Amino acid sequence: MLTTLVVTASLLFTGAPAQSTATKPLTFRGMTLQIPRTWKVGKEDMWGIHVKTGGCDRLAVECRGFYLVGPEGISLARHGNPYDPAEPYHPGNGLAACVPDKRYVADFPGKLVARGLRPVGAGHKATYRVWRVGCATQSARRTGVSYQERIWHLPKSKILIFDQWSNGRLGTILERATWS
């Protein structure tokens, strides 16, 4: 009786069963993430998949979220060159809009503020970078607006995870990824 009560109380306070039902699987290139059911998964295109994790700020370029990028998006990064871990990721050519405020442009390259290796499921390590990117006017005047860009790159799996909103849950979700 006491053991049953302790186990029941433990499940009640940890939320373990509720947590598993509050997620859904997202599979990309053999990697499966368990993401919250409330997150919206976009259609895959040549750049990858946009996963919307929250609301859409009025001035933001797009809704809060992150991208799962495959080989095509990795090979055609900034100015048509392959992704280079020595720079922030920017798909395409030309100026990049400032993520939190579309009135401005991203002032690349920004400042590297963290680097290392991070686990993405068992047996997979990603090259990890965090860049602080400032925003400027079209005439290159600084604005005081900035954002952080986090990148997990798995070169062997040809996956790049690109987060411009510093989602607090994403790191843990990636650590718990499974592979097929």
Language model features: what each stretch is:
Residues 45-168:
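Conserved polar/disulfide-associated segments of primarily extracytoplasmic proteins
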Residues 1-63, 147, 153-180:
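N-terminal targeting sequences that direct proteins away from the cytosol to non-cytosolic compartments
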